[in-house]
Amino acid sequence: MVSLSDYLILSSVIFCIGLVGIFVNRTNIITLLMCVELILVAVNTNFVAFSHFLGNEVGQIFVFFILTVAAAEVAIGLAILTLLFRNRGSISVDVTNSLKG
């Protein structure tokens, strides 16, 4: 039987991998987006684990909202990256510093 602490350990490892990825690799925007998604997966794992072990469905409902926001984030982020690569030829973070509002 898998206990709550096992889920929390897994979630904290995934969260730490996402944080390390953000701090170590600051040059590629796609990698930064993937690390943000890892952090969201860790949060979703916590919500589902607590929801299961506490016996209510509120955490699972929150997961659906988080997944919806994450899907919108990825769609908008990849659209911006596609346009950035088409116009500038690179998706480096240094190139995005010169974006105009």
UniProtKB/Swiss-Prot annotation:
Recorded GO MF terms: NADH:ubiquinone reductase (non-electrogenic) activity; quinone binding
The keyword Methyltransferase belongs to this UniProt entry's keyword annotation: no
GO biological process: ATP synthesis coupled electron transport
Topology term for the membrane: Multi-pass membrane protein
Main location: membrane
Keyword Isomerase tagged: no
Enzyme class: translocase
Disulfide linkage: none
Record's keyword terms, sorted: Cell inner membrane, Cell membrane, Membrane, NAD, Quinone, Translocase, Transmembrane, Transmembrane helix, Transport, Ubiquinone
EC number: 7.1.1.-
Spans traversing the lipid bilayer: 4-24, 29-49, 61-81
GO cellular component: NADH dehydrogenase complex; plasma membrane
Pfam families reported for this sequence: Oxidored_q2
Superkingdom of the source species: Bacteria
Family: Belongs to the complex I subunit 4L family.
Job of this protein: NDH-1 shuttles electrons from NADH, via FMN and iron-sulfur (Fe-S) centers, to quinones in the respiratory chain. The immediate electron acceptor for the enzyme in this species is believed to be ubiquinone. Couples the redox reaction to proton translocation (for every two electrons transferred, four hydrogen ions are translocated across the cytoplasmic membrane), and thus conserves the redox energy in a proton gradient.
Subunit structure: NDH-1 is composed of 14 different subunits. Subunits NuoA, H, J, K, L, M, N constitute the membrane sector of the complex.
Full protein name: NADH-quinone oxidoreductase subunit K
Species whose genome carries this gene: Ruthia magnifica subsp. Calyptogena magnifica
